[in-house]
Each structure stands twice: as C-alpha cells, then as structure tokens.
Amino acid sequence: MIRVAINGYGRIGRSILRALYESGKRQQIQIVAINELAKPEAIRHLTQYDTTHGRFGQTVELQEGKLHIGDDAIALFHQSDATKLPWGELDIDIVFEASGSLIEREACEAHIISGAKQVLISHPSSQDVDATIVYGVNHHLLAAEHTVVSNASCTTNCIVPVIDVLDSHFGVISGAITTIHSAMNDQQVIDAYHDDLRRTRAAGQSIIPVDTKLARGIERILPKMKDKFEAISVRVPTINVTAIDVSVTLRDRVDISIINSVLQQAAKGRFDGILGYTDEPLVSCDFNHDPRSSIVDATQTRVSDGHLVKLLLWCDNEWGFANRMLDTSLAMIRAKSAKSVK
C-alpha cells in the first residue's frame, strides 16, 4: 500500500482524492494526510460537495481534527512551511504537490527534507526535476532514484499522446495549437487587480487570451518535436472541460478516414483508458468527469491538400489529470520496486 499526502487541497488536490475512491485504486493507494491552509470545515464541505463534479459518493466527516471518509481517517495539517510537515513520522511514500506555489525542484525538495520519499508535482516544473511524465507516453523512463517528478500539465497530457501517434504513423513536420481552456481560479469573478492585465477582467464575460508554454511542454516529452510546434491559449466562460484545436502538417499523404482510423485504433490499443475517440455530436459538458487524458472528436477532423490535418481534442482538465496523477504515482512505485527486486 502506497502512503501518500496531498499538499494543497484545491481543485486538483480534491479531484485526486475523489478520483482515488472512484477509480478502484484505493486498494493500492492510501491518502494519509492533507496539508491545506483552509479551515477544516471548509475542507470537509468542499470534499463532500462540488459544483463541477457533484456530490461525493462517500460520507465525509470531521472527527478529532481528522477527515474521515468511510473507514479512512486522514490527518489534516495547516502548515505554510513544507519543511515542518511530519512526512517522515507518517512514513509518506509520495507527496502529491498540488498547491501551485511550490513549482521549482528546489522548493519541492522541502517535502524530501520533511521525510517524504518522493514528490509528484501537479504542474510543469523546472528542467532540473528528475522526470516530466505524460503517462502512457514516457512513464517507462521513471527510475528508482527519481525523487522529484512532474506530471506535466492537463493540456500536455491531452495533446502529446495524439502527436505521438501521428508522428509514429505519418511523420509530423510542424504544428500550431490553440487551447480553448475553461476558466481557472487565477482569474477574477469581477474586474480586479492582477499582474496579467487580461486576467484583471471578469472571467464569465470574456474570452481571455493567456500565456501558455504548451509547445515547450511537448518538446520536453517528445524531443523530436523541438521547434516544430507553437501554441496559444484562450480561457472561456465555462468552469470545466477544455478543447484543443490542433493543426499538424504531416510528411505522408493522408485523408480523414485514415487519420480517424489510426487514432481510433490507438484509443483501443496502446492508449486504452488514456486516449478516447468519439464520432457523436457532443459538446464540452459531455466530457465532464471523464477520466481519460484526451478524447478525439472524429466529427471535426479535417484534411487539406493531403498533408495539413486539423483535429479537435477534448479533456476534463481536472478529472482526467487527477487520474493521471494516480497512474504516475503507481508507476513511480513500480520503478522503485523493480530496482529492489534486482
């Protein structure tokens, strides 16, 4: 049984916990502790009730300073200094770093100082982390000696499996991406101050361009794609689910049926459970609470001049990513166990 702690119990932290109980991985992973500055009653309430994902199927109670979910008792901490957390005493195998404030490797090593064996970061990190993983594409690179690992971003997890499939079958020459991302909690409900002037504006009233490093994230996972992609991102007035509009120039000549067939086979085969495929006339809310990293919308596939391909991909940017955090954590432990067996 893997003993884990969650540092930062916001959208991703809570999704990780709920996904664990819904995914069937509860027999492999135990959440021992949560570190979150919010008040315990707010933690309990937002675990039980969620505007996006609905009411949690488990009963959640507070007893003697612990969060009780069924028969599980989870210790709660409210510590701003991660070096003061009792991860060693609690024998924590992996910390899910989901606070959004500990981004660089050096900052995340505070958990190692506190006694945790490994850290899995829920966002892109600095180049000096031991590995940046998109589960299903490069998790085989995990090694026993890796202590600080990044799970990349939700959009990187969405697009990289598709690029990997296209490149292996047809050769990718270049690409341009537009991420159509739901609003996030770094935006404003009504106009208010922010360092990014566009994010000073009300999230529910505008389509808002924001910076993205998605193209660089693709390169980190697929080095062959270096300098081949550029990306822009806009935030839209929805609270969950993201679409990615991707245009790719391929080496080989293709048509719509060939592209869709290859992606459908990948979804049934190597990327089963990670990549999805649909030819139904669906909209964004239909992908809410979808555990897969990416779903190809086959109705939107277009091909121009045999080489320029346009695709539309969907993902639940919270739930899909939370499920990959669980998958990557198990892969980290398997890598560690493989060395000990040798």
UniProtKB/Swiss-Prot annotation:
One of its GO terms (biological process) is pyridoxal phosphate biosynthetic process. It catalyses: D-erythrose 4-phosphate + NAD(+) + H2O = 4-phospho-D-erythronate + NADH + 2 H(+). SUPFAM superfamilies: Glyceraldehyde-3-phosphate dehydrogenase-like, C-terminal domain (SSF55347), NAD(P)-binding Rossmann-fold domains (SSF51735). It is an enzyme of class 1 (oxidoreductase). One of its GO terms (cellular component) is cytoplasm. It holds the Pfam family Gp_dh_C. Keywords: Cytoplasm, NAD, Oxidoreductase, Pyridoxine biosynthesis. NAD(+) binds at residues 11-12, 317. GO terms for molecular function: erythrose-4-phosphate dehydrogenase activity; NAD binding. Its EC number is 1.2.1.72. Catalyzes the NAD-dependent conversion of D-erythrose 4-phosphate to 4-phosphoerythronate. HAMAP family: E4P_dehydrog. This is D-erythrose-4-phosphate dehydrogenase. The gene is epd.
